[in-house]
């Protein structure tokens, strides 16, 4: 059985992530969506909340061969522990490649038997990032085209509804 790991913070999971999971699920027998407990980024959602959002998203999109698991430590060690043949990474733009390439080389050095495979999302998801989605949500923008419904609802609860014009801006005369 060919099992792969798709790791990330998923704070929150977006339709871009779903797109990559869909591609991986078609190519491999099992996709483990690894939700990182430790991250250098400050997260909006706690690990348990991120896990729930990922699990509900996998169920909503009927990914019968994908599961979500939390993990700590090195991603490549987690992949080895799960007997994964590869780590899946999504590439949105050339700017992603340099960082992902360095990570892939380091992972290869640590565990040469674990490959890193890059998958590109569809054009309509290539610009998506969790950070942008959170910022748009904070500013009261419409995010339904970027995230699953369960995530949109969770963001509204977490961030709260804001006025469309929360700050009056005065212009110099």
From Swiss-Prot:
<dbReference type="Pfam" id="PF01467">
    <property type="entry name" value="CTP_transf_like"/>
</dbReference>
<feature type="binding site">
    <location>
        <begin position="90"/>
        <end position="92"/>
    </location>
    <ligand>
        <name>ATP</name>
    </ligand>
</feature>
<protein>
    <recommendedName>
        <fullName>Phosphopantetheine adenylyltransferase</fullName>
        <ecNumber>2.7.7.3</ecNumber>
    </recommendedName>
</protein>
<feature type="binding site">
    <location>
        <position position="100"/>
    </location>
    <ligand>
        <name>ATP</name>
    </ligand>
</feature>
<comment type="pathway">
    <text>Cofactor biosynthesis; coenzyme A biosynthesis; CoA from (R)-pantothenate: step 4/5.</text>
</comment>
<comment type="function">
    <text>Reversibly transfers an adenylyl group from ATP to 4'-phosphopantetheine, yielding dephospho-CoA (dPCoA) and pyrophosphate.</text>
</comment>
<dbReference type="GO" id="GO:0005737">
    <property type="term" value="C:cytoplasm"/>
</dbReference>
<feature type="binding site">
    <location>
        <begin position="125"/>
        <end position="131"/>
    </location>
    <ligand>
        <name>ATP</name>
    </ligand>
</feature>
<keyword id="KW-0547">Nucleotide-binding</keyword>
<feature type="binding site">
    <location>
        <position position="89"/>
    </location>
    <ligand>
        <name>substrate</name>
    </ligand>
</feature>
<dbReference type="GO" id="GO:0005524">
    <property type="term" value="F:ATP binding"/>
</dbReference>
<keyword id="KW-0067">ATP-binding</keyword>
<feature type="binding site">
    <location>
        <position position="75"/>
    </location>
    <ligand>
        <name>substrate</name>
    </ligand>
</feature>
<dbReference type="GO" id="GO:0015937">
    <property type="term" value="P:coenzyme A biosynthetic process"/>
</dbReference>
<feature type="binding site">
    <location>
        <position position="17"/>
    </location>
    <ligand>
        <name>ATP</name>
    </ligand>
</feature>
<feature type="binding site">
    <location>
        <position position="41"/>
    </location>
    <ligand>
        <name>substrate</name>
    </ligand>
</feature>
<keyword id="KW-0173">Coenzyme A biosynthesis</keyword>
<dbReference type="InterPro" id="IPR001980">
    <property type="entry name" value="PPAT"/>
</dbReference>
<feature type="binding site">
    <location>
        <begin position="9"/>
        <end position="10"/>
    </location>
    <ligand>
        <name>ATP</name>
    </ligand>
</feature>
<dbReference type="InterPro" id="IPR004821">
    <property type="entry name" value="Cyt_trans-like"/>
</dbReference>
<comment type="subunit">
    <text>Homohexamer.</text>
</comment>
<feature type="binding site">
    <location>
        <position position="9"/>
    </location>
    <ligand>
        <name>substrate</name>
    </ligand>
</feature>
<dbReference type="GO" id="GO:0004595">
    <property type="term" value="F:pantetheine-phosphate adenylyltransferase activity"/>
</dbReference>
<keyword id="KW-0460">Magnesium</keyword>
<feature type="site" description="Transition state stabilizer">
    <location>
        <position position="17"/>
    </location>
</feature>
<keyword id="KW-0548">Nucleotidyltransferase</keyword>
<keyword id="KW-0808">Transferase</keyword>
<keyword id="KW-0963">Cytoplasm</keyword>
<comment type="similarity">
    <text>Belongs to the bacterial CoaD family.</text>
</comment>
<dbReference type="InterPro" id="IPR014729">
    <property type="entry name" value="Rossmann-like_a/b/a_fold"/>
</dbReference>
């Amino acid at each position: 059985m060919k099992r792969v790991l798709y790791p990330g913070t998923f704070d929150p999971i977006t339709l871009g992530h779903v797109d990559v999971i869909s591609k991986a699920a078609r190519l491999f027998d099992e996709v483990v969506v690894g939700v990182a407990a430790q991250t250098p980024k400050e997260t909006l959602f706690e690990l348990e909340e991120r896990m729930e959002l990922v699990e509900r998203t996998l169920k909503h999109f009927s990914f019968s061969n994908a599961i979500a698991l939390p993990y700590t430590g090195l991603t490549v060690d987690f992949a080895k522990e799960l007997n994964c043949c590869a780590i899946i990474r999504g590439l949105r733009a050339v700017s992603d490649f340099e960082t992902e390439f360095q990570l892939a080389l380091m992972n290869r050095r640590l565990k040469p038997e674990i490959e890193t495979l890059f998958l590109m999302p569809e054009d309509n998801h290539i610009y998506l990032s969790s950070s942008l989605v959170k910022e748009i949500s904070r500013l009261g923008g419409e995010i339904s085209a970027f995230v699953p419904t369960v995530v949109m609802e969770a963001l509204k609860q977490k961030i709260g509804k804001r006025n469309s014009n929360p700050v009056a801006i005065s212009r110099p005369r």
